[in-house]
Amino acid sequence: MCRVTLEQIFQHHITQKYVNRSGMVHAIAVAYHAFHHTSVDAATKAGFLHDIGHHTWYRNGEWDYELYKKNDIHAIKGAERAHKLLIRLGEHPKQAKEISVAILLHTDSFLLEQALERTPLQNIIKWVDEADEEPGGAHHYRTISYEKALQAIKRLDEMVDRELQTQQSTSSAPISTNEKAEKIC
């Protein structure tokens, strides 16, 4: 299997529809923050897609942040939507699930007052999302042109590729011919 790139995810019409609705600038910022932590490939994808399940909550033509906070299940919808998208693009099912569960657990908004033990990836996505938040949900309304967003995504893809190559070259385990073909394509 070839690595599904952030650029492939970014250019998909489902991503354009739903990530633009929830805030492309925020999605890219969270993906960049996530790069500096655990599994860079999974973390950047989960960071980029973490709000793909957002629904807009309006009352009398105005965004109602309190209504959103009270009724939100975007993490549930987003986990399902991201999983379906990643599988369609050819992501390995195990990684698609890991990314989707990190999206599911990136917020406590749908949980009923219970503590969860999160994996390192799940914690990172929660923390980096919170790091980019602005009062009243303003982080969802920053704008960026398609071209600038695409440049930022391509740059992040290059960073991920370099990190994966570094990890591969420092790994002491021999790599099979099939694994080499999978990572190179």
Predicted features and spans:
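Divalent metal-dependent phosphate-bond-processing catalytic cores, especially two-metal-ion Mg2+/Mn2+ enzymes
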Residues: I14-D41, L49, R59, E91, ...
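Acidic/histidine metal-binding catalytic segments
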Residues: S39-K45, L89-L104
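Conserved acidic
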Residues: S22, K70, H74, Q95
